[in-house]
């Protein structure tokens, strides 16, 4: 079901150029641009999210982008964000994840995923909204530490937490379409 937010929207023909470009891409991919129509009410915040969070932390940062794409897709899959999944799958494929890996998120076939991949996906499960008691315990820390330094583990945790918080915002404000299985109706 398409989102029906209470917040007002900016008509597509009145969107700022950068938000209009993102809206066009979303309409082509998803057939919905609600997120961009609403966020156009606060273009400075939208630009911070895209330029500062995505541009500097998510895309650059210390951790290889492939692992952040894996983390993001695992979170959006757990949360049931259809809007997110539609874009995140494409980005994950472009970052080097295989279609087979994406299709095996649930059973986490050890032949398909590396130990680093499995540790990142376990971290995503700890950070997800559906796991309010999730923590970085000694076992997971040890598994992550085999592949990442502390600065990289902090970055993965921070990125995952920001994405989880944004997902909560998107659902609470009804800005995106949800998967049928989404537990957050």
Question: Across the structure, where does each feature detected by a protein language model lie?
Answer:
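Acidic/histidine-rich alpha-helical segments that form the ligand environment
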Residues: 116-158
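Iron-sulfur (Fe-S) cluster-binding segments and ferredoxin-like electron-carrier domains
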Residues: 85-103
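Mobile cap/lid helix-loop segments that border enzyme active or cofactor-binding sites
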Residues: 1-63, 93
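Preference for long, well-ordered alpha-helical segments
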Residues: 150-185
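Short alpha-helical scaffolding segments that buttress acidic/His motifs in well-ordered protein cores
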Residues: 39, 49, 53, 70-75, ...
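Short, thiol/selenol-centered motifs that function as redox-active sites or metal-ligating centers
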Residues: 68-71, 75-89
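Short acidic alpha-helix initiation/capping motifs at coil-to-helix transition points
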Residues: 45-50, 80-84, 130-137
